[in-house]
A protein has these predicted regions:
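Active-site metal-binding loops of divalent metal-dependent hydrolases
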Residues: 33-35, 100, 130
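N-terminal lobe of the biotin/lipoate ligase/transferase fold
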Residues: 1-87, 108, 115, 156-157
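Residue-level signal for inorganic ion chemistry
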Residues: 13, 58, 99, 129, ...
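Long, positively charged amphipathic alpha-helical accessory segments at protein N-termini or as interdomain linkers
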Residues: 65-68, 72-92, 102-188
Length: 188
């Protein structure tokens, strides 16, 4: 099962995970309430707020024995997150390779980074940023059209409850994904 290593504030869950990859285990989750230097693909800055119950800023550590479907991992994580967002009555769309949109606005982003020594994979760090409770005035700080579950539903989201659902969906599908890859668009 997973172990969650939580911080009030980090520069980045991804940076911490890279620095501590040796001691982190398969399925460990590094999380924080606020990132001071969160980033996505191409080092794009990820806006971080710890107001109103917060958002999701996590890195999931994976140390798979089978790397056959590694090229599908970001898409797999996005499908799992989309399935979780659907549980809140939202209709997610994908902007592949690594974004989820609601009504054309970004609600989540993912970044999978692997570390190899020669041909041996030391681990994969899957960074996830998901906007749970950002309000309209905070969304204006983001350099692209963005939204949050709260902005779409006008209901506050309990971060622990959301993460429990996300991890449940992930753990339910992950072993099959390692063996078979993504089968169709719908998981969960």
């Amino acid at each position: 099962m997973r172990r969650v290593i939580h911080f009030d504030e980090l520069n980045s869950t991804s940076v911490y995970s890279h620095q501590h990859l040796e001691e982190l285990e398969n399925f460990d989750v590094v999380s924080c309430d606020k990132q001071t230097f969160g980033h996505g693909q191409f080092e794009r800055k990820w806006y971080s707020s710890d107001k109103n119950g917060g958002n999701v800023y996590i890195s999931i550590i994976l140390k798979p024995s089978n790397l056959e479907h590694l090229n599908e991992l970001t898409r797999f994580i996005a499908l799992i997150a989309a399935s979780t967002l659907e549980e809140y009555g939202l209709k997610p769309a994908f902007k592949f390779p690594n974004d989820i949109l609601i009504n054309g606005k970004k609600i989540a982003g993912f970044l999978a980074e692997s570390e190899f020594i020669g041909t041996t994979c030391k681990g994969i760090i899957v960074g996830c940023g998901i906007n749970l409770n950002l309000e309209e005035n905070e969304l204006k700080n983001i350099d692209q059209p963005a939204t949050s579950i709260f902005n779409e539903t006008k209901k506050r989201v309990d971060k622990k409850e959301f993460l429990d659902k996300l991890f449940f969906n992930f753990e339910k599908e992950y072993e099959e994904f390692l063996v078979s890859g993504i089968k169709g668009e719908k998981l969960c």
